[in-house]
Amino acid sequence: MFLPFEYSSHVSMYVQSYTGISDRMADQNNISNSKQLVNTYMEVLKDDAVMAAIGELLLEQFDEVILSENFTFNMSGEIETESLRKCIELSTVTDTSAVKVIATAKNPEIAASICNNLTSIAPEYVAKAVGVGSINTIDKAKVYETPVAPNVIKNTLLGMAAALLIVVT
């Protein structure tokens, strides 16, 4: 049995807290507040409403058959939010107010679309949920044709080691 290839794409977003005041102390406070907002924003971006909105966009962009290779669907024909959430990893970039989004899927175009769809809807959902600051996209996700999993070399070496152990014993 062969493991299917998985592809990854990523995008970065910048959290900005602003007061409208422009001086050195206010700028330092804005940077500090932005770093504190990052975790709040990441929780908002993992919410079911955000996942459902991304799922709707994916259904508009891709054939349901292709999507079914990556996600499970509910009785209404929508992508299950939990199956979509499992494909997305959100992390902070150390000592910054940047958020890195990594999406992994069995199709490289879907992985990139997940990232780009998230960045397109994030400002609206963050504004509604938090009401403070903003989130901006730093770059756009690209389609990477090189699979990130399974690691063929690692799996081959592990298989050879296991076979060697069986032969030796």
Question: Where do the protein language model's features map onto the residues?
Answer:
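Hydrophobic and amphipathic membrane-targeting/association helices
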Residues: 1-169
